Amino acid sequence: PIAGSMVLAAILLKLGGYGIIRMMQILPTTKTDVFLPFIVLALWGAILANLTCLQQTDLKSLIAYSSVSHMGLVVAAIIIQTPWGLSGAMALMIAHGFTSSALFCLANTTYERTHTRVLILTRGFHNILPMATTWWLLINLMNIATPPTINFTSELLIISALFNWCPTTMIMLGLSMLITASYSLHMFLSTQMGPTMLSSQTEPTHSREHLLMILHIIPLVLISMKPELVI
């Protein structure tokens, strides 16, 4: 069910990150180099999850694997135990909670009209539902952390923290971000562009679906531009 996917991606997936933050507080303050293998593992896991996204044919699976890749960045940022790293990790968890939830919502909107989640069968929506295409574009832009959303703020904090700690991590981080942009573009083009496969009359988008997307997008922009609202 779509509600379960949205709650799982937005809230339950973040409990692991919260648990790691709590555990790091009670661990002894060891020399940070001890954690290098774990940081490399987290970033490598993010890259592998991103590569898995690129070869997915199922829309819901693609969004689920994108959640895994973002949590790899969160884990790497938490492990280095710096104020910027922790701030970036918490901001990315909030940002990705809204973004992945919105993506699952859009995937369900597509599924209700096509009755399939296979990417090659869901193309051509920009001709039929132009407003839904606008939401797809906005949410995909947020997924690749474009300003002025909190996604951009959080990834900037994480990149700064990791670069200050070990400049070499930029190679893995940069590769991860490049693949993220690639699969986001692939997801958008696969669902929106090209000739439509739908033969019957398609139901138009409803006001409740537009409202749901607005309620996902407004917090992402507001928290970034006025963080004192939540801090």
From Swiss-Prot:
It catalyses: a ubiquinone + NADH + 5 H(+)(in) = a ubiquinol + NAD(+) + 4 H(+)(out). One of its GO terms (cellular component) is mitochondrial membrane. It is an enzyme of class 7 (translocase). InterPro entries: NADH_UbQ_OxRdtase (IPR003918), ND/Mrp_TM (IPR001750). It is found in: Mitochondrion membrane. It is a multi-pass membrane protein. Its EC number is 7.1.1.2. Keywords: Electron transport, Membrane, Mitochondrion, NAD, Respiratory chain, Translocase, Transmembrane, Transmembrane helix, Transport, Ubiquinone. It comes from the Eukaryota. The chain crosses the membrane at residues 1-21, 34-54, 61-80, 84-106, 128-148, 156-176, 211-231. GO terms for molecular function: NADH dehydrogenase (ubiquinone) activity; ubiquinone binding. Its main location: mitochondrion. GO terms for biological process: ATP synthesis coupled electron transport; electron transport coupled proton transport. Pfam families: Proton_antipo_M (PF00361). Core subunit of the mitochondrial membrane respiratory chain NADH dehydrogenase (Complex I) that is believed to belong to the minimal assembly required for catalysis. Complex I functions in the transfer of electrons from NADH to the respiratory chain. The immediate electron acceptor for the enzyme is believed to be ubiquinone. PANTHER family: NADH-UBIQUINONE OXIDOREDUCTASE CHAIN 4. Belongs to the complex I subunit 4 family. This is NADH-ubiquinone oxidoreductase chain 4. It comes from Tropidolaemus wagleri (Wagler's pit viper).
